[in-house]
Swiss-Prot record:
Protein name: UDP-GalNAc:beta-1,3-N-acetylgalactosaminyltransferase 1
Gene that this sequence comes from: B3galnt1
Disruption phenotype: Embryonic lethal. Lethality occurs at the preimplantation stage, between 3.5 and 4.5 days post-coitum (dpc).
Catalytic activity reported: a globoside Gb3Cer (d18:1(4E)) + UDP-N-acetyl-alpha-D-galactosamine = a globoside Gb4Cer (d18:1(4E)) + UDP + H(+)
Pfam families reported in the protein's UniProt record: Galactosyl_T
């Protein structure tokens, strides 16, 4: 009996291996057929920004403001307005910013205002969250919201909302900055940097991305389809971690947005609009002002940066408290 059992085991294993091989082959065949059935597009090497431009303003967005700031910014002349994209559920992140880099409203006599940009809660409205958000707005008055769904692919709608809000309700801002809730901002450094500029018009800066390739990997969140963006490279643009522009550009960019179809990447979209307006990126001489990728920063480095990306709410609070201590830096 023993030899028969030993003979049967390899046969079973061979049969199992054969089944797995056939299964993998079938899956591979399916993927090949699926890929071949997809429409294929030639990547356009030479970029023509007029490809995105429509002569009629057919892309003007008419979403309704459902929450707006308490302060009457139209009667103020803020030096800087910081607009932070946030999800409705990011309660802790907003609070962390309110008690750290967004707390102080005046730096050396220059007014700095911070607001949060939200859409409507995605999927079914969470009534508890909706009530909490209303209470938060009553308490702080710093939430700006429209009635589009708050999703990753709608980030561009938030940016368009931000430009519209500045146009209609805060037109006297000298500078605006768009950033995210996971970004550490050294507000004092930012104000100093802007005060030391030689010019304050037609100004745009941040973490520059030049000749950045469009990514076609379908299962990655940074994927963009050929239909949406047919070119090989993106325009020169600044990362959405934190870009800054002078107030005079806001109405020009907002008007251009009504002629340019939104794409899923809001920072690239702003870059397209600015390229159509022939506005160049001001590249900072100091390469240590903006950090796109999370890196280890000590307290002395934090005192030198303007914006660093990839921090949790807890880390933002901790690093802000550490930065305020009287630590002597020798570099």
């Amino acid at each position: 009996m023993a030899p028969a059992v030993l003979t049967a085991l390899p046969n079973r294993m061979s049969l199992r291996s054969l089944k797995w091989s056939l299964l993998l082959l079938s899956l591979l065949s399916f993927l090949v057929i699926w890929y071949l059935s997809l429409p294929h597009y030639n990547v356009i090497e030479r970029v023509n920004w007029m490809y995105f431009y429509e002569y009629e303003p057919i892309y003007r967005q008419d979403f309704r403001f459902t929450l707006r700031e308490h302060s009457n910014c139209s009667h103020q002349n803020p030096f800087l307005v910081i607009l932070v994209t946030s999800r409705p559920s990011d309660v802790k992140a907003r609070q962390a910013i309110r008690v750290t880099w967004g707390e102080k409203k005046s730096w050396w006599g220059y007014e700095v205002l911070t607001f949060f940009l939200l859409g409507q809660q995605a999927e079914r409205e969470d009534k508890t969250l909706a009530l909490s958000l209303e209470d938060e707005h009553v308490l702080y008055g710093d939430i700006i919201r429209q009635d589009f769904l708050d999703t990753y692919n709608n980030l561009t709608l938030k940016t368009i909302m931000a430009f519209r809000w500045v146009m209609e309700f805060c037109p006297n801002a000298k500078y605006i900055m768009k950033t995210d809730t996971d970004v550490f901002i050294n507000t004092g450094n930012l104000v100093k940097y802007l005060l030391n500029l030689n010019h304050s018009e037609k100004f745009f800066t941040g973490y520059p991305l030049i000749d950045n390739y469009s990514y076609r990997g379908f299962f990655h969140k940074n994927h963009i389809s050929y239909q949406e963006y047919p070119f090989k490279v993106f325009p020169p643009y600044c990362s959405g971690l934190g870009y800054i522009m002078s107030g005079d550009l806001v109405p020009r960019v907002y008007e251009m947005m009504s002629h340019v179809k939104p794409i899923k990447f809001e920072d690239v979209y702003v870059g397209i609009c600015l390229n159509l307006l022939k506005v160049d990126i001001h590249i900072p001489e100091d390469t240590n002002l903006f950090f796109l990728y999370r890196i280890h920063l000590d307290v002395c480095q934090l005192r030198r940066v303007i914006a660093a990306h990839g921090f949790s709410s807890k880390e933002i609070i901790t690093f802000w408290q550490v930065m305020l201590r009287n630590t002597t830096c020798h570099y």
